[in-house]
């Protein structure tokens, strides 16, 4: 374990460019990675925080086919959206790269060639699924079927997104082509494989022994399960035309498998950054005094904890990751996030609909971070955390301090008198917070760390509430100077240690307190809070109060919930499958049915039942009683006068002691609600027959 690293290489999982960034990506990977990187920089560490767009693989070619464009068109579109979203959200990558770029192609090709020349691969002929209609092999997501582990009928050829199991396409039960829907055949092809089974002893020693105490339990547990089940050789090449061409003899028509190509993107991104900054990239990947940390979601654990480390080990020149603090999944309003189903809160849309409120989303996502188990994002919780915590605690404290300092002293920090016991205790608590928060961040407990940040704001609020300077100002002006001086120390500390969590708020607060320019060496940093006598001195001029956070109203939340309901309805309609046709009926069978328009003239819910309603229906030939199972869908008073379609010559049937003399025709909408089948034209009278 590297306890005193000289530098840090921080990677965030490469987002896949077949769609924009959503809150699940942010909570799982990018917000915690950004908190960690900002924190390290504030401690003076040499940090390379890299990421980039993952632009190869089958889903992109499928999307391109559907949209009638090239794969390059698809990745160009989404790379632009993703990169701008990250920039606007304040994610401070030192470099954001692209795997379709030349630096990456060269780096990945060289990586493969060295392993090939060193004899690290095995070459085998295997039978792969092949679509005869499309005339191509079905790699990865070109094929779907039933997962052999959990029974999910929509598993992909590389992974089941329901249980997280990594698969080969030939593992699927009842596979079918995602291109044509055809049942594929098996056809022989030749590929290179990484023999993971040859590295089991290395992985057991390195992970199961070496990282048992410092890796997160969810990560360690999944890795142990994989190793215990026994590892198999895994193909590193694919029969595709989109990707990095296999750079050795026999590689025609083949590309590097995206799981092999993508993590090398961290190295190529570091190269781009180092070249731009005039630095040597190699120490960030090859020096034992560098700490390498991968931030990922749980669906990437196997790639970053087993496969990529084996690649690095087999290559021979690279360091191994010190930690892989993978998060679980974030759900949305109790349902799993889905890009394909549009069940998501998209970052670029959030930034448009909630301008200048990046920190609110950062705060809520960190507060609900799925660090060891899946967690849920709800708009109700989003509103509550903003209004009850950011506005009522953090914002309220800062506003009171700055307003009172301007009111009593024209914005000039007062000189303090002798500290009381409560002052001493408050300052001592203040000075302890940086190390407490640092300890949580260093252990990748970002939710816990942010909770302590809010506790510091609570400390400030409680201090002011207990000391009541607005009352004392009339009787003890000297005491008020000391109170405001102590409160300003807390406000100043908040401006510093909020930066990793709430960077936009931190910048506003520093400006409000008129802190030294951030480019200066004298700018307060993390450690200064616990070591410096005072963070803001008597005689210092601060600025005017500005609201750091605004209350979020119910109407804003209703708008977001309506968007989700519209998505839910659209998905239900798309998923609605027609009932299979019943057996053939003759024309004579049809003519036996007396279908006619009726009007409901009375309605009441049947006592002691949930579903049944007793209706009196005017059929044009008589008024009759019909018992219908519609009580859970309609109120009696709402359907009186409603025109309906009645099967009038159905044999009477007794239901709960009431004779039912017909049947009302109904259907279901996409949400499962019953709908009357009735004429939509006015002037159709009761008794009109339906032919």
From Swiss-Prot:
Source organism, top-level taxon: Bacteria
Binding site residues for ATP: 339
Gene3D superfamilies: HUPs (3.40.50.620), Isoleucyl-tRNA Synthetase, Domain 1 (1.10.730.10), Methionyl-tRNA synthetase, Zn-domain (2.20.28.20), Nucleic acid-binding proteins (2.40.50.140)
GO MF annotations in UniProt: ATP binding; metal ion binding; methionine-tRNA ligase activity; tRNA binding
Cofactor(s) the protein requires to work: Zn(2+)
Record text on cofactor binding: Binds 1 zinc ion per subunit.
Enzyme kind, highest EC tier: ligase
Catalytic activities: tRNA(Met) + L-methionine + ATP = L-methionyl-tRNA(Met) + AMP + diphosphate
One Pfam family it belongs to: tRNA_bind
Short motif 'KMSKS' region, span: 336-340
Residue ranges annotated for the tRNA-binding domain, each copy included: 589-691
Residues reported in the UniProt entry to bind Zn(2+): 147, 150, 160, 163
Function: Is required not only for elongation of protein synthesis but also for the initiation of all mRNA translation through initiator tRNA(fMet) aminoacylation.
Family per record: Belongs to the class-I aminoacyl-tRNA synthetase family. MetG type 1 subfamily.
Subunit structure comment from the entry: Homodimer.
PANTHER family reported for this sequence: METHIONINE--TRNA LIGASE, METHIONINE--TRNA LIGASE, CYTOPLASMIC
Name of the protein in its database record: Methionine--tRNA ligase
Organism field: Christiangramia forsetii (strain DSM 17595 / CGMCC 1.15422 / KT0803) (Gramella forsetii)
Gene: metG
